Each structure stands twice: as structure tokens, then as C-alpha cells.
Amino acid sequence: ILPTATQYSRNAIFSGLLPVDIEKKFPKQWKNDNDEGGKNLHEEEFFREQLKRIGKGDLKVSFTKVLNHQAGQELVNNIHNLLQNDINVIVYNFVDMLSHACTEMEVLKELANDEKSYRSITVSWFEHSPLYQALRKIADKKINIVMATDHGSIRVQKSAKVIGDKETTTNIRYKHGRNLNFEQKDVLSFRDPADAGLPMPNVNSSYIFAREDVYLCYPNNYNYYANYYRNTFQHGGVSLEEMIIPVVRMTSK
């Protein structure tokens, strides 16, 4: 799904709907990029509604979001209590937070300056994380675990110039707005958002998605932002690394 960004892809997973259909079905809950407030606050509601839609609304469900280490420890302590449910959804936010931190923190940018080192940091975190502890505690139980993610990321290398109005969004791998000017070779573009299953935030809104390892910068302070974001891990655009995601099903031995 495009954009390969959490507010679109994770909401789509839990709702079972394209973003344009989420907006139609849940107009009060859906928020576009420039709207104020959290963009992923209604995932549990979306998921429960999806279960009802497919005839599974009577299942006993829990929905847990782990946004920090303390919440992770609470998950470890409570993991056995979750086994009484039919479905337990656990959203673990660390890897997405890591990709953003590697852009904003110079130390992490140095430590994760290529794909190999980025994966190494992620593996090291996982091996010492509450998530791994929780999985080990239930490894002998007769349950199915499905692990997946909502999008990947790519190390960006090539800056490209985009011109838009003040309402144009800020993400450097995709943008939507009116009167966007860009080089067609750099992006996949949709003049009609509905063609990509996306809502239309404003009249005449269009979407563009950076191809391969391109990232999009505005003319203002272009050189500064081109240097700032070069060699960082980003998501939202069109690449195999962002769009093809792992889905793993695990059972106890």
C-alpha cells in the first residue's frame, strides 16, 4: 500500500480497508497528514469492526500497544494472562522509532550508517528486549504467533527538488498537495488519489511517491536538507525495501 507510512499502512492492516475506504467508513476517526492529533489512535476500533465484517465479531480480543520500555515490561509480566483470549494484537513501535531516531540523532546516524549496521542494531535490541522475553515465556504453549510489519525503510541517497504550496506535506519520501512541480523520473505520481486508494484531503490534491533511493526536498534551504537527510533510513515511497514486508507464522515445537 502507498504511502509506506504508519498512518496509512497500519490503519489499512487493522481495518482491512484502503485509506480512501477508511475515511468513508470512519470519517471522524480518519486524519489526513496535516490534521492535528494522533493518526493511529483508532486501530483497535478498526480491527474489531473488521472482525465483525468477516463474521468473527464474537472472538475474545485484546489490543496492546508498546510505546516504551515500561510498557514492554508490563507485557512480559502479563503475557500469560493474554493466553485466555482468542486473539491478542501487540503493536511494538521500537523499530519505527529507531528509523526516525537515526535521522535526528547524530550518534545513531553514525552507528547505523548502512544497511548492515542498521540491521545489527535492530538485532541487538531485539535480543535484549522485553518482546523477546515475552516470547520466550510462552514458547512452550500451543499457540500460533504471526509476526509482521506495516512497512520497511530504505537508505536514501539522491535528493530531488519539489515545489508545492504551503499545504504540501513534509514527508521526504511522499508528498500530497496542489500544484506540485517535480521531475517525473524521480517519482510515481497520482493526479487522482482514488487511483491509489487514497483520500483527497483538498480539492485538486495529488500524490507523489519517491522512487528507489530518492528523497524529496523543497527549494528553500535545499542544500542544507539535502545534506541532512542523505544516507538516512526513510519510508513512505516506492521501493522493494519499503513495500515488500515479512510475514512469519510461528508455532511451538
Name these PLM-found stretches:
Residues I1-K253:
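Feature captures the catalytic ectodomains and active-site-proximal regions of enzymes
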